[in-house]
Amino acid sequence: MNAFASGHAAHPDWRMALSMAAAQVDSQLAPQAPPTLGFVYFSDHYAAQAEALLAALRQRWPGVAWVGSVGLGVLASGVEYFDEPALVLLLAGLPREQFRVFSGARPLSGFDAFSALVHADPATPDLGELLVELSQRTASGYLFGGLAASRNGMQHVADGVWQGALSGVAFTQDVAMVSRVTQGCQPVGPVRRITAAEQNRVQRLDGEPALRCLLRDLDVTLKEPRTLLPRLRSTLVGLSEETEAMLGRGAMFGTDTRVRHLVGVDPAQEVVAVAEQVRVGMRLAFCRRDAQAARRDLVRICS
């Protein structure tokens, strides 16, 4: 078989979608190399049938370990399904000793994890701390994955269907992978150093009130609320540690930059609040989502 076999389909009946996607997968599988690990992502139109879907996957491919998640939309090669009943499958023939599926009911203890694919319920209390703890259990500290998204239950799959907490699959260092990051953002002003901050409140940038810097970058004033509010809603914040390079080629964000939401401003104190705890010394640049920036990132990643 190829390194991976994939399939995808959309249909009001999850059984029909699974049948169509499975036919695509089976056409790529070689009988001498059966799959051992499967990934399933399904839109929330199938959320109520998640248990039945997993049972059907197990019946079709006995012995395969399954991980995955629900989402408002799912993607495959060259196609996206958003807010419609659809699913995506990916199967791999990895040696079983090179991975382990984990969940709250099946912890990672005793496994020599190097990296991990993680799915999580976004409503989980202290999720950030749980991810840090899991990262510390891997040799590389590298986690990738995402949050479940649904209007009908935040299911994630790890040899069972779970809600709450997190689950996924860990890999040994024998599983080689290439990882690239795209933020899809364009800075709208210079990189500045945080010189005064408290929790998630940025008070001063390069010694100047943070809100004053933001308004200058957006070319707007507090006296123009009709112009100001839409621009604030579309503005994000790029953050990096003092020792990390924030900008890469073409004045774009580097791979170590974390993009967070702007969650509020305090005109009286000229303070900006962001969706992350910040510290003096960190680097900050205001930014916005940008289609051309995303395209450039993808070209860079695929080059």
Show where each model-derived region lies:
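Active-site-flanking structural segment that lines cofactor/substrate pockets
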Residues: 53
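Small-residue-enriched flexible segments
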Residues: 1-47, 56-58, 64-65, 69-303
